[in-house]
Amino acid sequence: MDRIHITGGTPLNGTIPISGAKNAALPLMIASLLTGETLELINVPRLADIAALTRILGNHGVDHMVVGKRPGQTAETGQTVRLTASNVIDTTAPYELVSTMRASFWVIAPLLARFGEAKVSLPGGCAIGTRPVNLLIMALEKLGAEIEIDGGYVVAKTKNGLRGAEIVFPSVTVGGTHVALMAAALAYGTTVIDNAAREPEVVDLAECLIKMGARIEGAGTSRIVVEGVARLGGTRHEVLPDRIETGTYAMAVAMTGGDVSLVNTRTDLLASALETLASTGTEVTALPDGIRVRRNGGGISPADVTTDPFPGFPTDLQAQFMALMTLAKGQSRIRETIFENRFMHVQELARLGARIRLDGDLAVVEGVERLKGAPVMATDLRASVSLVIGALAAEGETQINRVYHLDRGFEALEAKLARCGAQIERVRA
């Protein structure tokens, strides 16, 4: 099993290109099942989760082609992928494939909407609380689907096609909003989605669906209206920048000191996180093609954070921000309101010398003067990258085990950090 070795204490300086967002690319790839024409996606990151979904789509009969690199592209540049679902041979998504990644469960929506049936295994993926699929199933039932759970599979059918309806989510759900959008796009009549997720990745999916011929209004607000159409066509769409990768590297710069330009990204994708970061004494400046993050000298000021759905502070940056706060000059309080059991990184950060106390959904961080390198173990995607951030600032060497979690969500992480001066190396098993 691969490990990452980091010798900390070096400020980061230079430029880091931001990849396309995994959390946008996954639903966009799944949307290829809505049409028999080709969907071309630009700036798709090279990640384990992308490869896993490609296998799942291939199991359904979707043709997949990676277009060659353009001049000037590097290994850190996203790929262009063409997906064609003109010969779907199977509407079953088996356990051995779906269990590798939760988002693959979303294939149930386009399969049901286009073919009238789907049999999809209950999902796997990061073990963060329960993360139930009940809201996704509720949305499909509102649209007229007949659903039963049989042998660990969700079996969905519709006799005469899906029909528009009012869907009111009791809590904000990104996955539920993705599923509702894709299903409603091919449903008869009008669908209203209330308490819809407002995340940029939802907007990106809606914009792609509109290019494919869908009629959608209100994406980016809590009320989305979808007028179903008879068919969707192919299109070409560029995946939006990864706001979580952007925030992760911004916090790494803040923790180590230095001056880094994050390019191919936008401030509006994570305004709340950048505002919080600025309150810690880090200089954050918008650039024409990205964001400049600088902290040259001076201590890290403590700040309190509560995770919230967009436009609030992202839960996917909670672990990274906690790592930053371990070196703050004072106490900070971090409350997690989105997922249960998302403090699994606390025990491993403590191995580096962090002082963190947990009380339910609240983590109280007492800043320390320094961290010291130690062997640590990644438990999930975001926890693993928080350990990378901590290790970059720690004295001495840190060995991070189980880094396959990182490969699920961060493209060319070692190369991007190394080009800014980090002493980081992957040791192959």
Swiss-Prot record:
Which PANTHER family does UniProt cross-reference here? UDP-N-ACETYLGLUCOSAMINE 1-CARBOXYVINYLTRANSFERASE
Which residues does the annotation say bind UDP-N-acetyl-alpha-D-glucosamine? 102, 316, 338
Alphabetized GO MF terms: UDP-N-acetylglucosamine 1-carboxyvinyltransferase activity
Q: Which domain of life is it from?
A: Bacteria
Q: Where does phosphoenolpyruvate bind?
A: 22-23
- On this chain, the residues bearing 2-(S-cysteinyl)pyruvic acid O-phosphothioketal are 126
Give, as in the UniProt entry, the pathway in which the protein acts. Cell wall biogenesis; peptidoglycan biosynthesis
**Pfam families from the entry?**
EPSP_synthase
> Under what name is this protein listed?
UDP-N-acetylglucosamine 1-carboxyvinyltransferase
Cite the active-site annotation: 126
Alphabetical keyword list: Cell cycle, Cell division, Cell shape, Cell wall biogenesis/degradation, Cytoplasm, Peptidoglycan synthesis, Pyruvate, Transferase
Species of origin: Methylorubrum extorquens (strain PA1) (Methylobacterium extorquens)
Q: Which GO terms describe its biological process?
A: cell division; cell wall organization; peptidoglycan biosynthetic process; regulation of cell shape; UDP-N-acetylgalactosamine biosynthetic process
Asked whether the UniProt record includes Glycoprotein among its keywords, one would answer no
Location (main, coarse): cytoplasm
* Role noted for this protein: Cell wall formation. Adds enolpyruvyl to UDP-N-acetylglucosamine.
Please give the GO cellular component terms listed in this UniProt entry.
cytoplasm
> What's the name of its gene?
murA
Q: What is its EC number?
A: 2.5.1.7
- Where is the protein found, in the record's own terms? Cytoplasm
Q: Which family does it belong to?
A: Belongs to the EPSP synthase family. MurA subfamily.
According to UniProt, the reaction catalysed is: phosphoenolpyruvate + UDP-N-acetyl-alpha-D-glucosamine = UDP-N-acetyl-3-O-(1-carboxyvinyl)-alpha-D-glucosamine + phosphate
